[in-house]
Design a protein with these regions (language model features):
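Conserved "HGTGT" condensation-loop signature of ketosynthase/thiolase-family condensing enzymes
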Residues: 1-263, 270-272, 283-459
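Active-site-adjacent substructure of cysteine-protease-like catalytic cores
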Residues: 274-279
Length: 459
């Protein structure tokens, strides 16, 4: 009801004002009055409720002085963890996790009217575009390599944009591997046929759902080629086997990596772009493209993100003088019905997954310093995220301590959440605190990850 009142009052007031003044609203007006204003009203309501609860709770506690003193809480056992040695992103509002995190903190990152794409009525669509992607250079270099290796997949223009961003991420992460101290020993061990000390690098791509098998296979081999070009031995890298639809779910891939027998060294990378005529037409034909008439539609985005994950030994060998943030736990689930079709937001599943992830990580919700999410501007997703924040982390300020990557960088499938994870790693490192990373962009799938700092955090 609160959500309906906030959005209803804002929209009706804006429409009445524009009609009474005979004014045609600009794009900034649409974003401000149809999105920003109602969300600000909701945030103010939640903040007021939190302040009221903080005042009333001590008074309620004073009425039960006879209660027995509770025993000190026992920290739940922790499962396996992986060190997040490095992260890389290419996003519309940042070419690194630190740059993107700073922009999100300033609340200045917003989509804009696209300079190239129009809807069916000829109006520019709202998008989140990376300005400096050099797709032509990637197309030329990769096409020559594909021809030399007898592969000829047909990539669309938007796929070339994705591959350009993804290639930059792979090259950046590969540079960290060059510091491995066992690289110099490897060639000698191979020549002498001795047991190899250098670990096997597992390259794990996460794909867009509409990429065909031939697109995925060629791109995976291209990324492998880039890692080898950066100096990593060809015999110490393997591409994870294809698993079909599972390869589009970053949460499933992370959970598998975070198993009882995690790999010693893994590179997780994803890339995508929805900034093409085909993607815009699909969204528009499905009644899912954001416009002035459909403010709950999706805003297409693009980008790439990657993580370099290792066990404790490899993290020490690759260390740069300090320890690394940890991926402590991942919890995933599916909604019984599409969130796009539900009449009201339901945060129950996301709350359960958050509680489970925190339990598996051995952390309390009170230790969380920030939430990094792939949530976009849509009311259903915002309300779901705020439902988790208000229940599990009342200590957080929704306007300051929650980063919504999707609202700033648009919708780009797995890229959006992996970008949020990269930002979470950066914040865990800089704040030396626990970060909760949430995914609720998909209509059905929900994921929660817990990122911890290098040092132990009191629970």
């Amino acid at each position: 009801m609160t959500m309906m009142l906030a959005f209803g009052a804002s929209w009706l007031g804006a429409v009445w004002f524009w009609r009474s003044t005979n004014r045609v609203p600009a794009t900034d007006d649409l974003v401000l009055y149809l999105l920003v204003l109602p969300l600000a009203l909701l945030a103010a309501f939640w903040l007021g409720r939190k302040i009221y609860s903080g005042i009333s709770m001590p008074a309620a506690a004073a009425t039960s002085t006879a209660a027995a003193q509770p025993a000190a809480p026992v920290a739940p056992p922790r499962g396996p963890s992986l060190s997040l040695v490095a992260a890389a992103v290419r996003a519309p509002h940042g070419a690194s996790p630190a740059e993107l995190g700073a922009t999100l903190a300033e609340n200045k990152a917003r989509p804009a009217l696209d300079p190239e794409l129009n809807d069916a009525y000829g109006y520019p669509v709202m998008s989140a575009r990376i300005a400096d992607i050099d797709a032509d250079a990637t197309r030329t270099e990769m096409s020559d390599w594909l021809a030399a290796n007898h592969m000829a997949p047909h990539y669309s223009d938007e796929q070339w944009r994705a591959l350009s961003a993804g290639s930059e991420v792979v090259v950046e992460l590969s540079a960290y591997l060059g510091a491995h101290p066992l690289l110099e020993l490897h060639a000698g061990q191979v020549a002498r046929r001795e047991p190899l000390s250098l670990p096997m690098l597992q390259l794990q791509p996460v794909w867009q759902a509409d990429w065909k098998p031939e697109h995925r296979q060629a791109a995976a081999l291209w990324f492998r080629h880039l890692v080898i070009q950066s100096g990593w031995p060809e015999d110490r890298i393997t591409v994870a086997p294809e698993r079909g639809a599972v390869d589009t779910e970053a949460g499933t891939v992370l959970a598998r990596l975070l198993s009882n027998e995690p790999p010693a060294l893994a590179m997780l990378v994803t890339c995508g772009s929805h900034l093409g005529t085909g993607s815009v037409e699909r969204l528009e034909n499905g009644g899912a493209l954001f416009s002035a008439n459909l403010p709950q539609g999706q805003i297409p985005g693009e980008g790439a993100a990657g993580l370099l994950l290792t066990d404790a030994l490899q993290a020490t060998l690759l260390g740069t003088g300090g320890e690394h943030p940890q991926l402590l736990a991942v919890s995933s689930g599916r909604l019984p019905h599409s969130a796009d079709q539900s009449k009201r937001a339901n945060a129950e599943l996301l709350q359960e997954l958050s509680a489970k992830a925190l339990h598996d990580a051995g952390r309390e919700a009170s230790a969380i310093a920030l939430i990094s999410a792939d949530t976009d501007h849509r009311t259903s997703r915002v309300m779901e995220l705020m439902g988790v924040a208000s229940e599990a982390t009342p200590q957080l300020d929704p306007g300051v301590d929650i980063f919504s990557v999707g609202a700033s960088c648009g919708n780009c499938g797995a890229v959006t959440w992996l970008t949020a994870l990269a930002v979470a790693r950066q914040e865990a490192e800089s704040r030396k605190a626990v970060i909760l990373c949430i995914s609720n962009l998909d209509p059905f799938r929900r994921d929660v990850a817990v990122i911890g700092p290098a040092a132990a955090v009191p629970v």
